[in-house]
Amino acid sequence: MATKSVGVVVFSEDQKSVLLQKREDFRVWGIPSGRIENGETHEETAIRETQEETGYLIQIERYVGEYWRPQLPGGGDTLYVYTGRVIGGKAEDHGWESVAVEWFAPQQLPGRTVRFVREYIADSLIGSIEPVKKTQLLPWWYINLLRAGLILRGIRNQVRDHL
């Protein structure tokens, strides 16, 4: 069954930097994101996930758009992307899902930044009045690596939960 998630491109006050978190599981850089929980609005999910993954409390600024990723395991995923700005908190309070939280210039993102994330940031910078609606496809080899990584992460989490 397809899932629904929310992601947030968090900009600095001067709009010259974007907040990224380095994921604990795959060690890649991405924006704060996660699945929508029962009864949550998109905005509530965005605020919760950003605080959990980065330690920062944010205010939602703008809806960027909807990205359908049909190849993701479980029947695909729709990601609703927003922009936000920090209104409190500190990076030192990030949760276990992140091993690092840092600000980067959009033109100087780290090499291990997820390809889709680069697109979300670019679309956020354009500032279009109309929300974007895109389908994002991945190469077959990337899908296979992702599936293997998710299986290994699941096994690791089960082992960790039993220790």
What are these regions (language model features)?
Residues 16-52, 56:
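Conserved Nudix-box catalytic region and its N-terminal flanking loop in Nudix hydrolases
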